[in-house]
Amino acid sequence: MGVTVVSHPLVQHKLTIMRKKETSTASFRRLLKEISLLLCYEVTRNLELTTMSIETPLMPMEAPVLEGKKLVFASILRAGNGLLEGMLDLVPAARVAHIGLYRDHDTLQPIEYYFKAPEDIVNRLVIVVDPMLATANSAIAAIDKLKERGATNIRFLCLLAAPEGIERFTKAHPDVEVFTASIDERLDEKGYIVPGLGDAGDRMYGTK
């Protein structure tokens, strides 16, 4: 399906402020909400429409509305939750799934500790959200789990991606399109994206 880099000037401007090491936790959290709304606009750009009969104050008309069941936003915990607020502001009727994964700092492999999703996920477009696509191990594991539950229409949304992560992800899930604000230079020896913005979860919640 490929990779879409969202190059909108507002996205790029806000991302630059988020990258700065002196940006406060409060500002980082606010910017993450703002940029997630803009990214959500892009990832939902080609949703299918149908029409419904309505009446305006002047006359009846056939007006466009979204077709099919509501979206599912699937957050990879914990950092993925930072993207949810802005996205739910834009699509308040969306369902939400949570996938609890943490990365073993020695092996860099994901370890699952929680999974909760709508039962009828098979009939819905699922947008998986995580700020970083670094090694891609967590993203691959999350989508493996969603596919096990029957999801077939999946997209992945992140702030930053590493070339190594994109390569691994697209090999594992070639049917899932990736949307990101930036493809950075590389991963460092600890598996972090560089130049990156640090640990998104820590910067969002003020932890280390």
UniProtKB/Swiss-Prot annotation:
Catalysed reactions, as listed in the record: UMP + diphosphate = 5-phospho-alpha-D-ribose 1-diphosphate + uracil
The cysteines joined by S-S bonds are none
Keyword Glycosyltransferase among record annotations: yes
Keywords noted in UniProt: Allosteric enzyme, Glycosyltransferase, GTP-binding, Magnesium, Nucleotide-binding, Transferase
Q: Which residues bind uracil?
A: I193, G198, D199, A200
UniProt GO BP:
UMP salvage; uracil salvage
Sites where the protein binds 5-phospho-alpha-D-ribose 1-diphosphate: R78, R103, D130, P131, M132, L133, A134, T135, A136, N137, S138, D199
Pathway, per Swiss-Prot/TrEMBL?
A: Pyrimidine metabolism; UMP biosynthesis via salvage pathway; UMP from uracil: step 1/1
Q: What is its EC number?
A: 2.4.2.9
Q: Which InterPro entries match?
A: PRibTrfase_dom, PRTase-like, Upp_B, UPRTase/APRTase, Ura_phspho_trans
User: What SUPFAM superfamilies does the record tag this protein with?
Assistant: PRTase-like
How is the cofactor bound here? Binds 1 Mg(2+) ion per subunit. The magnesium is bound as Mg-PRPP.
Which cofactors must be present for this protein to function?
Mg(2+)
MF term (GO), any: uracil phosphoribosyltransferase activity
Task: Report whether Magnesium shows up as a keyword of the record.
Answer: yes
Q: Any known activators or inhibitors?
A: Allosterically activated by GTP.
Instruction: Name the family.
Output: Belongs to the UPRTase family.
Query: Which PANTHER family does the record cross-reference, listed alphabetically?
Result: ADENINE PHOSPHORIBOSYLTRANSFERASE, URACIL PHOSPHORIBOSYLTRANSFERASE, CHLOROPLASTIC
NCBIfam families for the chain: PRK00129.1 (NF001097), upp (TIGR01091)
**Purpose:** Catalyzes the conversion of uracil and 5-phospho-alpha-D-ribose 1-diphosphate (PRPP) to UMP and diphosphate.
Task: Write down what this protein is called.
Answer: Uracil phosphoribosyltransferase
